[in-house]
Amino acid sequence: MRGQPSIKHLDDVPAEEMLRYEFADGHTASIWEKWIELSPRYVAFWNKWDPGAVSPRHGHVGDHSNLILAGELRCGDIVARAGTHIMLEWGDVFGPWEAGPHGCELYGFIAGEGQPFSGDTAAYEALLKSRGARSVPLPMPKHLPPWMLAKLGGDFTSSVTQWSSST
């Protein structure tokens, strides 16, 4: 317990590049994240998806809530536009998601440590192939707290992220 509220403005929170995709035509699309609050008990975050950015089928350790603030995300026939709420309980997976033509912004909250885990990768790989895209490795985010760095170790590469301390 802090004994008082934690109040932060989004402009005061640094953005981290979570995922980047390179497309056959040479353009890139990324997913950017701001960790508003990050603790072993919960994660509050904001995402900005560039148009066409994708996220693999995955879940997180903890119940997970997303609210689409602007733009849209698509998963097959599902279109989650601004105002859409997505709720996943611990163990649920979702995706692959693809940002719409204007990208997407969302607010998310995970009640738990938030570590991602992979779902079935076949649909994600098929989506990347159909878009002429590939995921590229990124440096480990700079603003991870010590408890998370200790848990992840030097590199954290999965079908969800490709972070490396040597990139």
Model-predicted regions and their roles:
Residues F45-W49, I68-G71, L106-F109:
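Short, well-ordered beta-strand segments in beta-rich or mixed alpha/beta enzyme
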Residues G26-W32, E37-G59, E89-V93:
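Conserved short histidine dyad/triad with adjacent acidic residue
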Residues V79-R81, W90-D120:
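Ligand-binding loop in jelly-roll beta-barrel domains
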Residues H64, T121-K129:
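Short intrinsically disordered coil segments
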Residues P51, H60-C75, A82:
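Glycine- and acidic-residue-biased ligand/ion/polar-headgroup-sensing regions
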Residues M1-R41, Y124, A133-T167:
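A short, N-terminal "cap"/entry segment at the start of jelly-roll beta-barrel domains
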Residues W32, H64, H102:
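Residues that flank catalytic or metal-binding motifs in active/ligand-binding sites
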